[in-house]
């Protein structure tokens, strides 16, 4: 997926679990443009993971074996916590 195709990335952010939508969509909407190109590629790789894995990682019930994905999970958690709740 092209890091500049925001419509397609936005669609990929829509998950099958509301809990994931609450974590991933606000991060994409508020933070994606400020990421480096490498971070955008890692974010897209994270979106390619299965929902149960994403849920577990974002809810701190484990972590990805891949260090880059782990960094992105932590970044999503940190930025979402700093920004606070947002309406989706």
From Swiss-Prot:
Consequence of changing residue 19 to A: Flavinylates FrdA but not SdhA
InterPro entries per UniProt: SDH, SDH_sf, SdhE_FAD_assembly_factor
Chaperone is among the record's keywords: yes
A GO CC annotation given for this chain: cytoplasm
Keyword ATP-binding among record annotations: no
A Pfam family it matches: Sdh5
Protein's cellular compartments: Cytoplasm
Domain of life, source organism: Bacteria
Keywords: Chaperone, Cytoplasm
SUPFAM superfamilies, per database record: YgfY-like
Family: Belongs to the SdhE FAD assembly factor family.
Self-association and partners: Monomer. Can be cross-linked to FrdA and SdhA.
Protein name: FAD assembly factor SdhE
Organism: Escherichia coli (strain K12)
Gene: sdhE
């Amino acid at each position: 997926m092209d890091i500049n195709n925001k419509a397609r990335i936005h669609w990929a952010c829509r998950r099958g679990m509301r809990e994931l939508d609450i974590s991933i969509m606000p991060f994409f909407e508020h933070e994606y443009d400020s990421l480096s190109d490498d971070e955008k590629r890692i974010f897209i790789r994270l979106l390619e993971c299965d929902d149960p894995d994403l849920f577990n990682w974002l809810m701190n019930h484990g972590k990805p074996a891949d260090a880059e994905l782990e960094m992105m999970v932590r970044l999503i958690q940190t930025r979402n916590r700093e920004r606070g709740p947002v309406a989706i």
